[in-house]
Design a protein with these regions (language model features):
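Multi-pass alpha-helical membrane architecture of UbiA-family
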Residues: 1-322
Length: 322
């Protein structure tokens, strides 16, 4: 059972589940309450949609494991045993079962809430995950960018579901949301998507550093293999500084809206400080195991981003009360 949970990537699945629920409860619902006494999408439908995204993430983890094992056997010129072949076949079947279940749930929501675009995005996301594992994961720098984009897209999914449904029901619910209001909530989602993109890129590149020697033996052309450790650290430093700068800008925008010093302090402490700690240790690190520890540490920054959503929701909660 433990092996199956690991194969499904239960940690990333849990992050998707909690993240999407928090984006809805802390940002979307308070935003709607400024203009309507309800939301367009019922909670049960949103829950089905969220579990569909969780299944897509699980299928993504399974297909990545399948192709990693397959590639390792090919490079090592190793003939798999019957037990290993059966395990690989089971992984491939599991991917398609999870993918079909995920798209069935997305299709249910699309039919019930007249938001067919959601099913289209789900199909594109599933195909993106499949081709990432099949091809882009092992390509120079492209793999790091593709995986970061896939994770960033997830951030927009809760809002896109509401937008598509609202557009289709606009004749029943006349549009009363000012353009400024729409821009403000979309700006928050853009910020969080940018945060997720950058932290995923940094984390994936850190993992490439940790697997440097192993990738050399497998003839995989990752960024550290081609450009070296020094160039990789320079790139990581630049992206990390960009991440911190984005956080500072986000906090500044936050302060202008709600003028609460304690929330500003918490936001800086919650995101900028962990990245400064990462930068200090990155430039001191030389051993492979230390890179692995940094990779694991960056997983905690995702949790920091989830906590930040709680404070971002205060923008709309306070405005709703006013």
């Amino acid at each position: 059972m433990k092996e199956y949970f690991k194969l499904l990537g239960w940690q990333s699945c849990l992050l998707v589940l909690i993240g999407m629920l928090m984006l809805r409860t802390q940002i979307i619902i308070p935003f709607y309450q400024m203009y309507f006494p309800f939301t367009i999408i019922p909670f049960v439908d949103f829950l089905a949609f969220t579990f569909g995204m969780v299944l897509i993430m699980a299928s993504f983890n399974v297909i990545c494991s399948y192709y990693d094992t397959q590639m390792s056997d090919i490079i090592a010129k190793k003939k798999p045993t019957k037990a290993e072949e059966l395990e690989q076949k089971n992984k491939y079947r599991m991917f398609w079962v999870l993918a079909i279940l995920a798209l069935a749930m997305e299709g249910f929501v699309a039919i019930k809430d007249n938001a067919w675009q959601v099913l289209g995005i789900g199909i594109v996301f599933e195909l993106g995950a499949y081709f990432y594992a099949l091809k882009y994961k092992r390509e120079y720098l492209i793999g790091n960018i593709v995986i970061s984009l896939l994770f960033a897209i997830i951030v927009f999914m809760p809002m896109l579901l509401e937008v598509f449904a609202f557009k289709n029901y606009q004749s029943e619910f006349p549009l009363r949301i000012p353009v400024v209001g729409i821009q403000s909530v979309m700006l928050v989602f853009v910020y969080f998507a940018a945060f997720v993109f950058l932290i995923t890129f940094i984390r994936d590149l850190t993992l490439d550093l940790a697997n440097l020697e192993d990738n050399k033996q497998k003839d995989l052309i990752t960024f550290p293999v081609k450009e070296g450790v020094k160039a990789t650290k320079i790139l990581l430093n630049a992206v990390s500084v960009l991440f911190i700068a984005l956080n500072v800008w986000f906090v500044y925008q936050f302060y202008e809206v709600i003028d609460m010093v304690h929330i500003v302090f918490i936001l800086v402490l919650n995101i900028a400080f962990p990245m400064v700690y990462y930068l200090v240790n990155l430039n001191r690190t030389k051993l492979q195991m230390q890179y692995v520890m940094l990779y694991q540490y960056l997983g905690m920054v995702y949790i920091s981003l989830l906590l930040t959503i709680l404070f971002a929701g205060d923008i709309f909660k306070i405005n709703a009360i006013i």
